[in-house]
């Protein structure tokens, strides 16, 4: 790897699977894509350990980007309905998990655990940042276990409208 080449650990966290790979700045993959089942029940600590395990299994990266479902503000989890359940999507929210996740600073926790700069955003926002042209209004809708949505204007993420 050239000294000026910056690799990013990219993790897409879904309700059923956690998908990951290492990318360079142009989006070229420097690892085979990885996919593991999302473990449940999934506390913030278990999530962090799972992401650490993913990181350790892939080539070294300079930084990380983690997209996860739910409302995320500046890397802090406001709500992540899939992960607040004991058995996964479309099951009853567990009050104890809800309390653990609500207000959890995932960006700071992952930055410390991975020992690299880490950005944590809503998964639709991460997806959109990778595909928008930067011209005018652009809407990104993602369909997976859940439905994701993001609006960009002039290449910048617009205020949240959940």
Q: Each PLM stretch: what is its role?
A:
Residues 44-49, 62-63, 72-131:
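Glycine-rich phosphate-binding loop and adjoining helix at the ATP-binding site
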């Amino acid at each position: 790897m050239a000294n000026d080449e910056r690799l990013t650990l990219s993790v897409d966290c879904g309700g059923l699977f956690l998908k990951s790979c290492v990318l360079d700045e142009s989006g070229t993959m420097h690892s085979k894509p990885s996919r593991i089942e999302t473990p449940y029940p999934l506390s913030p600590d278990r999530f962090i350990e799972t992401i650490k395990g993913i990181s350790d299994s892939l080539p070294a990266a300079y930084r990380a980007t983690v997209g996860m479902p739910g409302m995320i503000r500046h890397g802090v989890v406001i709500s992540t309905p899939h992960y607040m359940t004991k058995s996964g999507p479309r099951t009853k929210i567990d009050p104890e998990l809800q309390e653990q996740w609500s207000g959890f600073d995932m960006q700071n926790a992952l930055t410390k655990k991975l020992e690299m700069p880490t950005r944590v955003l809503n998964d639709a926002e991460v997806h959109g940042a990778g595909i928008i042209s930067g011209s005018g209004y652009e809407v990104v809708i993602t369909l997976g276990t859940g439905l994701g949505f993001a609006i960009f204007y002039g290449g910048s993420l617009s205020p949240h409208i959940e």
